[in-house]
């Protein structure tokens, strides 16, 4: 994968999970390594040394001098923002010298291409979006497994792609299907990545400090598509639909949409409601010839007017994951699996089986007919909007933390519609309070999450939910979102004990 270069000199910037994976991958291919990190002693340095990887380590600020000594390739960790001045100067210097800058995803794409010369041709499915990535990735992996495929799930979800690929090679167990969760950070440096099918679930404000603007963030998401990649797009999201090819465009890639309304284009997916029951459905042209995989049909672009029927797949209530947003995630996963011609029957069985991921609209207890819901992974406004609208019941919301410069205005409508009260915590509680004041919903400030949970429990009525969906990052008060969830769960356990219930 390194062409004709013998033992090329590679500079790896950043020693997080992906940086360590890049270093391991390069070392196994005989590369000489220089690893740089702004930290003098990054946590993964000990792991690198324990594995016996021979590498020069340089701690401290990045400078173009790191390229000295014959660097032929730069591996860039996804957590490093290209807008950071020192990194931007280093990357510019690399470009001037003709030194390629790859992220882990590009290393992975190049590795698959090299393996392809030996006959390895797996299917690759990829998922991105502001929210729902992990759920949809895990669900897609399960669907493919239940269809009899050997599957590897990797990327932003962990493990790192290169680590998973190395393990598969060592075990002589290369998968039939790769299912990759990809963040905007990982996609920023994508160059030749071209999966068989890829989905963008949604695009709302997030990571603007890293990308610099919403447009730059959205464009990074769009790098998930290659020229021939089947595009699976959320038609309810205008920012996502900008990646739909123009109608009638020559050589346009195959496109499938999903949404929470009835689909009207042959091969699209959505929800149909009949007698109070919501169904997951596929739009089918009654006049189209039968084919083994409906999503691989090319839409007719002639004068033919399709006679669309709504083919029922399963009731939405049969899903074990709650909320309309999760119905959309299920449709996206189903569309991806069908895009690589997997049969529908085992996919539908798997949809009924999947129980969801921790900290993602997860009901952790029901006490006195009040649901306690952990959505600590809801670290941006879009995630909290989805949780509120998806639960569709009266809610006492707990929100707040580090808002990362977001606009909280999208919370106004769902809070006004669904919330009985809002408990505010963390650094940006005042900003959220100012935004939500117009809703007329009672707002209360709390110094601790524990206090907010107990106050929420006192306000909740039977049939309500107490929802931790902060719309913010956690680092102003907690180690990470999982620590925040642990504190929430401990408080719920206390409430259960106080009420003589079993959480």
From Swiss-Prot:
Cell wall formation. Catalyzes the addition of glutamate to the nucleotide precursor UDP-N-acetylmuramoyl-L-alanine (UMA). Its EC number is 6.3.2.9. It holds the Pfam family Mur_ligase_M. Pathway: Cell wall biogenesis; peptidoglycan biosynthesis. Its main location: cytoplasm. The lineage of its organism: Bacteria, Pseudomonadati, Pseudomonadota, Betaproteobacteria, Burkholderiales. InterPro entries: Mur-like_cat_sf (IPR036565), Mur_ligase_C (IPR004101), Mur_ligase_C_dom_sf (IPR036615), Mur_ligase_cen (IPR013221), MurD (IPR005762). GO terms for molecular function: ATP binding; UDP-N-acetylmuramoylalanine-D-glutamate ligase activity. This is UDP-N-acetylmuramoylalanine--D-glutamate ligase. It comes from Burkholderia lata (strain ATCC 17760 / DSM 23089 / LMG 22485 / NCIMB 9086 / R18194 / 383).
